[in-house]
C-alpha cells in the first residue's frame, strides 16, 4: 500500500488555484488514483467543478446548523464527485466575524477524527486561501498535514511576490517538520517570457517549475458548465496539459526547503527579463504636471 501523499496548493488570490487543483485532481482520478480535496477557503469554491455545484455546503455551516461539529457525521460533510473524488469544504464565519482560518483547523481535525483519511486514498489536496501562510490557513503545513507544497503563480510581479512570501512561510515550518516545497505551477497569463521567468524564479527558490499550464479559453468554457477539462472535453489539448501536470506530481520526488529571495532580488529578476524598468529616483514624488514641465 503506497503512502498517502498530502499536498497543499498555495498562491496569490485570483491566480487560479482552485481551477488548477480541480483540473489536476480530475486527471489523477481519471488515471485511477483515489483523491480527496479539502477546500480551505471561506468562498467554498474548491470543489464546484468536481461536484457540478455552485458551492458545497461547508463544515462550518453544517456545524452551526447542527449546534457543533461534534453533532456531525462524516457523510454530512463529505460528497463524492467526478471519478470518485471525495470533496469537503471547510468554510468559515460570516465576513467580518471571527477567524476564517479557524474553519480550516476545525474541518481537518474533524476529518481525522472521523476516519476520512482512509487507507484507500492516494492523495489529499488542500486548496488554500490566497497567499496567507499564517494562522489557521497555515494549518495544512504548520501541523505537518501536508508534506508537499505546490505554489501556483504566473509571470506577473504580484504573483511572483506572493510565491516568494509563501516560500518564506514554508521555511518557517520546514525547520520543525517535514513540509517541503514541491515546485511551482505556472498558470499562464500570457506575459512576456513567462516560462523562462518562472523557471528562473524557481531556480532562485531552490525548486523547479513543475509544469507550465498554457492559457486556453476552453478552461472557462468548462467552468461555465461547472466541469473540469478532463470531463468536459477529454480529447482537448488543455485536458492533456492537466494530465501532464498530474503525472509530474505523481512522479515528483524533488521536495526542498526553499531559499526565498529579498524584494530587491525579485525586482532585479524582473528587470533582467525586461518585465520591469529600472527605477529612476529623480522622478519619485513628482506629479504628471511637474514631469511634463521638466520635459518641455
UniProtKB/Swiss-Prot annotation:
InterPro entries annotated for this entry? Answer: NifH/chlL_CS, NifH/frxC, Nitrogenase_Fe_NifH, P-loop_NTPase
Name the coenzymes or cofactors required: [4Fe-4S] cluster
Q: Is the keyword Ubl conjugation in the record?
A: no
Q: Reaction catalysed by this chain?
A: N2 + 8 reduced [2Fe-2S]-[ferredoxin] + 16 ATP + 16 H2O = H2 + 8 oxidized [2Fe-2S]-[ferredoxin] + 2 NH4(+) + 16 ADP + 16 phosphate + 6 H(+)
Instruction: Return the CDD domains for the record.
Output: NifH (cd02040)
Q: Which GO terms describe its molecular function?
A: 4 iron, 4 sulfur cluster binding; ATP binding; metal ion binding; nitrogenase activity
Positions with a binding annotation for ATP:
11-18
Keywords assigned by UniProt?
4Fe-4S, ADP-ribosylation, ATP-binding, Iron, Iron-sulfur, Metal-binding, Nitrogen fixation, Nucleotide-binding, Oxidoreductase
- What does it do? The key enzymatic reactions in nitrogen fixation are catalyzed by the nitrogenase complex, which has 2 components: the iron protein and the molybdenum-iron protein.
Any idea what this protein is called?
A: Nitrogenase iron protein
Gene source species: Dechloromonas aromatica (strain RCB)
Q: Which gene encodes it?
A: nifH
Amino acid at each position: 500500500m503506497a503512502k498517502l501523499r498530502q499536498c497543499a496548493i498555495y498562491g496569490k488570490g485570483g491566480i487560479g488555484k482552485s481551477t488548477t487543483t480541480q483540473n489536476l485532481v480530475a486527471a489523477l482520478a481519471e488515471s485511477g488514483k483515489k483523491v480527496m480535496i479539502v477546500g480551505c477557503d471561506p468562498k467554498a469554491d474548491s470543489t464546484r467543478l468536481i461536484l457540478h455545484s455552485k458551492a458545497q455546503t461547508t463544515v462550518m455551516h453544517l456545524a452551526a446548523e447542527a449546534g457543533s461539529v461534534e453533532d456531525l457525521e462524516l457523510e454530512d460533510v463529505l460528497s463524492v464527485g467526478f471519478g470518485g473524488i471525495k470533496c469537503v469544504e471547510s468554510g468559515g464565519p460570516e465576513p467580518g466575524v471571527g477567524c476564517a482560518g479557524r474553519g480550516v483547523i476545525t474541518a481537518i481535525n474533524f476529518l481525522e477524527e472521523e476516519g476520512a483519511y482512509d487507507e484507500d486514498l492516494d492523495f489529499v489536496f488542500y486548496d488554500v486561501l490566497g497567499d496567507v501562510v499564517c494562522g489557521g490557513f497555515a494549518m495544512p503545513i504548520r501541523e505537518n498535514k501536508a508534506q508537499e507544497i505546490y505554489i501556483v503563480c504566473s509571470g506577473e510581479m504580484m504573483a511572483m511576490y506572493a510565491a516568494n512570501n509563501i516560500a518564506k512561510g514554508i521555511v518557517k515550518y520546514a525547520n520543525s517538520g517535514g513540509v517541503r516545497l514541491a515546485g511551482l505551477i505556472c498558470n499562464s497569463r500570457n506575459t512576456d517570457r513567462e516560462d523562462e521567468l518562472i523557471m528562473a524564479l524557481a531556480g532562485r527558490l531552490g525548486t523547479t517549475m513543475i509544469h507550465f499550464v498554457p492559457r486556453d479559453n476552453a478552461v472557462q468554457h468548462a467552468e461555465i458548465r461547472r466541469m473540469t477539462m478532463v470531463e468536459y472535453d477529454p480529447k482537448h489539448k488543455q485536458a492533456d496539459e492537466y494530465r501532464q501536470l498530474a503525472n509530474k506530481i505523481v512522479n515528483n520526488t524533488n521536495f526542498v526547503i526553499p531559499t526565498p529571495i529579498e524584494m530587491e532580488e525579485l525586482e532585479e529578476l524582473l528587470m533582467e527579463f525586461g518585465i520591469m524598468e529600472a527605477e529612476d529616483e529623480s522622478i519619485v514624488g513628482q506629479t504628471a504636471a511637474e514631469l511634463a514641465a521638466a520635459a518641455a
